[in-house]
Amino acid sequence: DLVANQLDDHSASVCLDIGSNDGLFLQTLKARFGSEILGIDPAHAPAEHARSQGVETWEEFFSDDSVLRIKDRFKKIDVISANNVFAHNDDLISFATNVASLMHDGSVFSFEFSYLVDVVEKGLIGTVFHEHVSTHSLLSLIPFLNRCGLDLVDIKRIDTQGGAAIGFAKLHSAKAPVSESVANLLLLEHKLGLDTARGINIFRDRIMADKIKVAELLKPYAGETVGGFGAARSANLLIDFFELGPFLNFIIDDSPQKCGKWLNAFEVPIL
């Protein structure tokens, strides 16, 4: 709804969702705007489910080749979305440049990303793991988008994964007005010292203090039966950083795909 509300003033005749998963977001746009929709997602199971729900989905990565085929079919796209995709992409310059090439001056690009302010303020070490190759501040994001021909025109903070943000970008040629929220968050980032090493040092000091607290908390339970809850993607990172391996006897998870397996690098069974 947050993204859909942002699009009320924009034409949404053709919508593309990159990393479209089960197609639910595209279904929302189609129901609200009557849009022609297309999803791109390389994962077979969610792509197949999306197609079963009537959402056209190309089972592939967003690439130079897919961009050419999109242009052949639609010429330009009105709304492009990429929810929780930025952090997983190791070539953001090509990604954003390709997005910009599909846009016209009335197009909008909405994207969710891991927000550095939340990571620093809340000590979100669990978001820093092998699948997440980037975390952005606006201080880094704005010049990056400019390099790719895009301007950040609005920003909304959300609670996903402890703290993230949704950015809205338009082509630089559109000369679109910039929301006050962008300037407000830039001011906050300067106050937190994210334009220097100071802000990152605050994050380092916080998680090191948390590590000491966890060690003190677990010390009385050495030799006892200790279980964990949730074999999340970040579990290996947390176990390694907080040195939990010697204490954990098992981890409980409600995912049938994980039960009966072991955490990588640790002899901790998942029940």
Positions of the model-derived regions?
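Conserved class I S-adenosyl-L-methionine
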Residues: 11-21, 226
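Conserved SAM-binding loop of SAM-dependent methyltransferases across substrates and taxa
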Residues: 22-33
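Class I SAM-dependent methyltransferase SAM/SAH-binding core
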Residues: 31-66, 250, 256-258
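A solvent-exposed beta-alpha-beta segment
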Residues: 51-53, 216-271
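A conserved beta-strand element that flanks and buttresses the S-adenosyl-L-methionine
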Residues: 78-81
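A short glycine-rich, Lys/Arg-flanked "PGG" loop and its adjoining helix->strand segment in the class I
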Residues: 93-108
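Short, glycine-/aromatic-enriched active-site segment of Class I SAM-dependent methyltransferases
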Residues: 109-134, 138-141, 145
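Flexible, glycine-/basic-rich loop-and-beta segments that form/coincide
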Residues: 162-207
